[in-house]
Amino acid sequence: MLKEFKEFALKGNMIDLAIGVIIGGAFGGLVNSIVNDIFMPIIGLITGGIDFSNMFIQLAGEKQATLSAAKAAGATISYGNFITLLINFLIIAWVLFLFVKSMNKIRRKQEEEETSKKMSLEQQLLSEIRDLLAKKK
């Protein structure tokens, strides 16, 4: 049983998956930084200095000026955080879409090259017949 687990864990797909998860985690941090440190300030500037991280609806307690104070005072809906996460998601989805699209294009090109290199059985036989006829002349 231990041997089977070792074979399973050391298969290429499992290792590839582990590497993908690690890279995905690092990519998530990078996207968060891009969104929070670059895009959100620009969007805030365009929208008149609105700070999305501090946008909320307070459901209970006295009205507070900041999200952290409102959360301490009672229930809140943090829709600014949702907007930020939505932008994160859209950026990640767009980058992954471009990556998959380029990988599919590369794969299609390789398949076309392999297909053009491989001759069908008929083509091989005709080539052999042609070569034999050329030798007889």
From Swiss-Prot:
The keyword S-adenosyl-L-methionine does not apply. Keywords: Cell inner membrane, Cell membrane, Ion channel, Ion transport, Membrane, Transmembrane, Transmembrane helix, Transport. One of its GO terms (cellular component) is plasma membrane. It is found in: Cell inner membrane. SUPFAM superfamilies: Gated mechanosensitive channel. The chain crosses the membrane at residues 15-35, 38-58, 80-100. NCBIfam families: mscL, PRK00567.1-4, PRK13952.1. This is Large-conductance mechanosensitive channel. It comes from Bartonella henselae (strain ATCC 49882 / DSM 28221 / CCUG 30454 / Houston 1).
